[in-house]
Each structure stands twice: as structure tokens, then as C-alpha cells.
Amino acid sequence: MDQPAAAEIVNLHKTFKTGLGKPVVHAVRGIDMNIRQGEVYGLIGPNGSGKSTLMKALLGLVRPTEGSCSIFGRSSLAPDSKEEVGFLPENPYFYKFLTGAETVSFYGKLCGLSEKPLKEKVRELLELVGLADAADRRLGGYSKGMLQRIGMAQALVQSPRLLVLDEPTAGVDPLGSRDIRNII
């Protein structure tokens, strides 16, 4: 039996109302995609072309106007479809009073990871993203690039089968961008 697609999008449309009497905005029109397990897939397009909206629909963060999205064969609108997904949004928000290690640990606990293995996982991930030396610094003192790296670590914390990254190298210096590409 074939494995379900990691991500499948069928005839996706998403429109947004912009105000009373104003025209609707067609963010996504008739997109079909089938991403198999193990594939790396990128979306390229100008600002405002619907890339982030498509990702949010795939993750069930916005409801499609028409069409459907699924993750490993489950509707993306079902809460359990996110159990095997790591997500780095375009502009992640983190609690500035937490340290890097506390932040990654926080997301690991949200994913149901237990304390002892989580502590080692946090150490490994901070090493992977090049922030082991900044693990005990508060995020309020991190640069934009460092915050993106923490975002990558939190997206990887539960060892997801599907990783969705929205502009993962935004604000990261060229060497950091290369490092993130190598992680991907």
C-alpha cells in the first residue's frame, strides 16, 4: 500500500474580505500540490502572491474558501494532523524573557516530550543551529538572525516528519543562511 503524501493540496482557493463594499482579495487560486515524504519543496513568488497563505491553509491555520489540504492523509483542519509537523512562521514570536534553551524546551513540552530526553534534545538542537554558546541568554538580547535560528530549533524539537518553513533565512546573515540551508 502506498504511503499518503506528506502534504496534499487539492484545488485550493482562499479569498479574504477587505471591508464592507470593497472587493475580495484572491490570495490563492486553484492550487494543486502533492509533496511526497522525503521531498524538499520550495515556493517562489513575489510578495503578496499567496505563499504564506498557502502554508497557513496547509497547516489548518486558515480555512480554505474552496478545496482541501491534508497532511499524511489527514485533513489539515483536524487537530491531530499537526502532531508530526514542525513549523517556522515568517515572523515568529517568542517570549523575550526566556532563554534560548528555555524557549526550545517550552515548545518541546507543548509537544509532549518528557523532561530528561528533552534536555538532551534541546542541547543537540542549539548546537545544530549554532546557538549552544547563547543557550542561557535571554531572547530579548538575540539578533533577528539568532531568533530565526531559535525558530528552526523549535520547529525541529519533536523530530517532525514534515517541516514547514516560511522564509527561514529572513534576517539571517549569509553564513547563517548557508547553515540553515544545510540543516534543511
Regions from the PLM with identified roles:
Residues 41-46:
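The feature captures the beta-strand-to-loop junction immediately N-terminal to the Walker
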Residues 67-81:
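Conserved ABC transporter NBD signature motif
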Residues 105, 109, 116-134:
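Conserved ABC ATPase "signature" region
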Residues 157-161:
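A short, proline-enriched helix->beta-strand linker immediately N-terminal to the Walker B motif
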Residues 163-166, 172:
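Catalytic Walker B motif of ABC-type/P-loop ATPase nucleotide-binding domains
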